[in-house]
Amino acid sequence: MKKRGIFILSAAVVLAAGLLCRHMLVQEREPEFVFSYAENQTEDYPTTLGAKEFAKLVEKRSNGRIQILVQAEGALGTESDVIAQIQYGGIDFARVSLSQLAEYIPELNVLQMPYLYTNSDHMWKVLDGEIGDAFLAATDESELVGLSWYDAGARNFYNSKKPITCLEDMAGMRIRVQESEVMVDMVEALGATALPIPYADVYSALERGTVDGAENNWPSYEAMNHYEVAKYYTVDEHNRVPEMQICSKNTWNKLSEDDQKMILDCAKESALYERKLWTEREADSKEMALKQGVEVVELSAAEKKRFQEAVMGVYEKYCADYMDVIEQIIAQNNK
């Protein structure tokens, strides 16, 4: 009986050891896929944190089979470079500005028309519905897969010269814009000179006087320390341009249908996470900028209407074939 007990105990120990070794082998097994993710913002920026949440969700739900390595601060190139690389599979995933993406997919210009949305609720009602889904699908012809919409807040003007309180104050201003024809035309329609300059070079351009001002959201203004060299911030909310999470079609086609669905679900969940972070960060960034002595001007409703009327030519130039979609977007605000 004693020998039998010892045998049973020994067998149990061997079995347990075997299970432990098997568990360790599973844990140490190389992932089936290791994908790259390009992000040009800082490590603590909402879009970067959203990307990391996306990567974490994918790794967890794939049981470690799929890893996504997020590389922030423009480590993989400018947004324009990243889009080009994603098209041929050199980069797998990215979060990019719609202004950059519209250079490849012209119909996306609709979503960056100035003064298109009344507020953020209006924008999300559009993007989280059928209209937004149709625009995500529009990436297909450019060797891309649109996954989800990230928040980038409302863009406003800021400068180093004077408070902008009316349309006439824009005259003669040299304003940095993204590399986007729509943004260039919008700024010039307002009477200023638009100068496309890489995002990372804006601080030095403001400091040297190469430009008088720029336009961006509160978190970008604060994160890049632009308040140090441009203390006049005018809230006009000329653009609510969302960001899009995209995947290379080359990468997408390597995945099973189940993995594709899982990644889409993770992307949409990470977008909700990012939007929450954005709202919090926007409030914090504004508070910090105010503490640094930034002078904030809120355009009056009457003056904002003048700004809106000044840019109507931009709609006619870029969206003549999409006015029905624009009407649908505007109508969403009344539902």
Locations of regions flagged by a protein language model:
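N-terminal secretory/targeting leader peptides
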Residues: K2-D121, I131, T139-K335
